[in-house]
Amino acid sequence: MNEETQNAAAQQETGAQFTIQRIYTKDVSFETPNSPAIFQKEWTPEVKLDLDTRSNKLDEGVFEVVLALTVTASIGEETAFLCEIQQAGIFTIADVEETQLAHMLGAFCPNVLFPYAREAVSNLVNRGTFPQLNLAPVNFDALFAQYMQQRTAQAEQASVDA
């Protein structure tokens, strides 16, 4: 049984539907606020990665998911570069339970988008003539589980305080 047949069989059994309609760059920014002086310094940067995800319901079973990355490279107190990417996708997700939908929007879809965002960051850093930057993989499943634990703890704390 080939992979397409297996996927079709799995979808028929569960009734769940998942389709990538489109992946696109929603917003991009690259800044080198301390150039050209920063190019004269020894390249020993501290690289910081911030990421965030959000989703919007566009239609019944159609969602936009946006993965926002901010990469900041600093040498001492000076910012070498600041790169911001919003990588987005439009996904069809139907016939799934609410908890499964939340996981797909908060972890599965960002996993799909991350390689595109990572490539965009790498290309922008390269065009800025900085040494190559390859972002490490991100475990969105673990981040989503941590987020859900925080929400549960906050809800429990709110009920205790009430």
Swiss-Prot record:
Q: Which cysteines are joined by disulfide bonds?
A: none
One GO term in the molecular function aspect is: unfolded protein binding
UniProt keywords, alphabetically: Chaperone, Cytoplasm, Protein transport, Translocation, Transport
UniProt-annotated location(s): Cytoplasm
Any one GO BP annotation for this protein: protein folding
Any keyword Mitochondrion?
Answer: no
Output a single Gene Ontology CC term carried by this record: cytoplasm
Whether Nucleus counts among this entry's keywords is no
* InterPro entries for the chain: SecB, SecB-like_sf
Residue spans making up a coiled coil are none
Q: Taxonomically, which superkingdom?
A: Bacteria
What is stated as this protein's family in its record? Belongs to the SecB family.
This molecule's function is given as:
One of the proteins required for the normal export of preproteins out of the cell cytoplasm. It is a molecular chaperone that binds to a subset of precursor proteins, maintaining them in a translocation-competent state. It also specifically binds to its receptor SecA.
Q: How does it assemble?
A: Homotetramer, a dimer of dimers. One homotetramer interacts with 1 SecA dimer.
Q: What is this protein called?
A: Protein-export protein SecB
Query: Which gene codes for it?
Result: secB
